[in-house]
Amino acid sequence: MIYQAETLQVKEVQDGIAELSFCSPKSVNKLDLATLESLDKALDALKAHQGLKGLMLTSDKDAFIVGADITEFLGLFAKTDAELDQWLQFANSIFNKLEDLPVPTISVLKGHTLGGGCECVLATDMRIGDKTTSIGLPETKLGIMPGFGGCVRLPRVIGADSAMEVITQGKACRADEALKIGLLDAVVDSDALYESALKTLTSAINEKLDWQARRKQKTSPLTLSKLESMMSFTMAKGLVAQKAGPHYPAPMTAVITIEEGARFARNEALDIERKHFVKLAKSEEAKSLVGLFLNDQYIKGLAKKSAKSASKDTQRAAVLGAGIMGGGIAYQSALKGVPVLMKDIAQPSLDLGMTEASKLLNKRLSRGRIDGFKMAGILASITPSLHYTGIEESDVIVEAVVENPKVKAAVLSEVESHVGEDTVITSNTSTIPINLLAKSLKRPENFCGMHFFNPVHRMPLVEIIRGEHTSDETINRVVAYAAKMGKSPIVVNDCPGFFVNRVLFPYFGGFSMLLRDGADFTKIDKIMERKFGWPMGPAYLLDVVGIDTAHHAQAVMAQGFPERMGKQGRDAIDALFEASKYGQKNGSGFYSYTIDRKGKPKKTFSEEILPVLADVCTDKQDFDDQTIIQRMMIPMINEVVLCLQEGIIATPQEADMTLVYGLGFPPFRGGVFRYLDSVGIAEFVAMAKQYSELGAMYQVPQMLIDMAAKGESFYGAQQQGSI
């Protein structure tokens, strides 16, 4: 043994050939701070080893290295610029040490080789993988960019254009793709991987492969003419500006880093990369996006815990109510390996549900994500039925009939009589209280809400609603089933609108009040999309949700929270509803809609909306951008905080993920609680007080007032990790 540490070891495997194997005692290999320090010492031991002729990098896991340890990021990023720069210099010196070994080096890859793992293998002379290899640099998705030499080495290995595409898109390349662009030198069968790597390394040792020329190319300036350079970087900047936009600076910074470093040799180019990395690492966007990643891991951890605690795994499911929603739920369940009975009282609805499932499967087939055999198997695992026969075999029932309390109660009571005593029954409802629906059941402890979002196959969130009688076992089984479906389940307590709709409608309330006071809805949409970062402004979102749906939900919310959400008079939603302007579904709402060549609705402004709004709005008044953002966001933020204060949602992490996954809250802002930390709670309280005369929706919750007085934040404890 040449060197041994907890997460890696080095031994001589053949005459003069050493193998450095990453072998963490945990389930995956990560380049955490401790592993980097061990790698540094291992390379020192290799340099001192007599008779070294070549080095192989391997992993004892199915994935080579999944990346750096992201849980350490926020702690690192909280350091001063100088401390972070110093640490990056140390990290880069390790990879330089690997790259500068006086012998040829090869990385032997399988599974994920991502982020820091990819940057590590770029420092070796050659890379060989099997067909499971997935290699890339996803850092820009976290608001940062490669900081261990990825912006320097990748362009010199695969060319500037391909490197900018991989880095700016945060892409992981499949083995065949990586081979095509030169990121891998060879792809072989898994059982031949080790021997092929040894053979390749031996060829390099025997000078049949010019490893020194490869190394020289990686440590020299990029070979681009002035014209090539200008064309490459100008085009890349244009594409990135169009795709990433102003709220996500990391992709553009990566392009600038590659451009600035192109004319320098490795060490000077690394200095440039370091400078830009530090700037990104200190940004609010990086803090938010890394925070979201950590929150996502937290939610996945909770789901795993629930699955372990559940006494029974869901092997079969049933959906009551077909159509688009029922078909979408059935498709998602079947796709993830849980056969499903889809029951409806009408054959046309069953046909629609099966058509929806077939359409979604055909899309996957046309994109090469499944083959015909797999598609047929998935479709066959959805059983459409007009009867309850066979439903007794289901472990979980998802009721997805029309949003009407009487109809739902009748269906729930009926299905309960057809299933076993330990069958879990859920209701896919967006507004009807779970405690109300539970009254129709003999076993309310086996019942909870399971709120899917439309379109089911695309929306990652499922809101799991706990009623006052719901048992922990029921929650655990439903959370485990949602996770099995590939969804992110968030458990909330029952209240009008649950969490998502409860916090959305004060936002719509702020919108209605702005219109009442003379604001232009097209300007509000523009500001909330371009400046704040929502995917859709409130008027457009209402059109997509459906004005009739929003009108109904608004009445439910007003009844549930009369003090904050009760209305003094008619508003814009009432006016559009009364004029039968329901939005996209009938071609006319705040905007008018036509169907484009791809069959998608295209919105345009039409003056016919103006007389409809005239009697609920005062004369036109211009509001500045900041006022619009504040008047729109304060009611939502207050309601989110009240939900935490009242225990409707358990943690800031779960609330923020729900907002991002369920409502499209701008990821670069990280959710309401991350946003409050970023703005400063005391600053938010002072700002909100300026609008207190607008009514109860603008009154700051006591929790925020108390936290502001104590100088507290919601995510203070997440700033961990040390250099």
Curated annotation (Swiss-Prot):
UniProt-annotated stretches for the region 3-hydroxyacyl-CoA dehydrogenase: 311-723
Pfam family, one: 3HCDH
Site, as annotated: Important for catalytic activity: 119, 139
Catalytic activity: a (3S)-3-hydroxyacyl-CoA + NAD(+) = a 3-oxoacyl-CoA + NADH + H(+); a (3S)-3-hydroxyacyl-CoA = a (2E)-enoyl-CoA + H2O; a 4-saturated-(3S)-3-hydroxyacyl-CoA = a (3E)-enoyl-CoA + H2O; (3S)-3-hydroxybutanoyl-CoA = (3R)-3-hydroxybutanoyl-CoA
Entries under PROSITE patterns matching the protein: 3HCDH
One annotated GO molecular function: long-chain-3-hydroxyacyl-CoA dehydrogenase activity
Entry annotation: catalytic residues: 451 (for 3-hydroxyacyl-coa dehydrogenase activity)
GO annotation, cellular component aspect: fatty acid beta-oxidation multienzyme complex
Key words, A-Z: Fatty acid metabolism, Isomerase, Lipid degradation, Lipid metabolism, Lyase, Multifunctional enzyme, NAD, Oxidoreductase
EC numbers, comma separated: 4.2.1.17, 5.1.2.3, 5.3.3.8, 1.1.1.35
Sequence intervals crossing the membrane: none
Amino-acid positions noted as binding substrate in the UniProt annotation, renumbered to this chain: 296, 501, 661
Pathway assigned in UniProt: Lipid metabolism; fatty acid beta-oxidation
Function comment: Involved in the aerobic and anaerobic degradation of long-chain fatty acids via beta-oxidation cycle. Catalyzes the formation of 3-oxoacyl-CoA from enoyl-CoA via L-3-hydroxyacyl-CoA. It can also use D-3-hydroxyacyl-CoA and cis-3-enoyl-CoA as substrate.
Alphabetical list of NCBIfam families matching this protein: FadB, PRK11730.1
Protein name stated in the entry: Fatty acid oxidation complex subunit alpha
Organism: Vibrio campbellii (strain ATCC BAA-1116)
Lineage: Bacteria, Pseudomonadati, Pseudomonadota, Gammaproteobacteria, Vibrionales
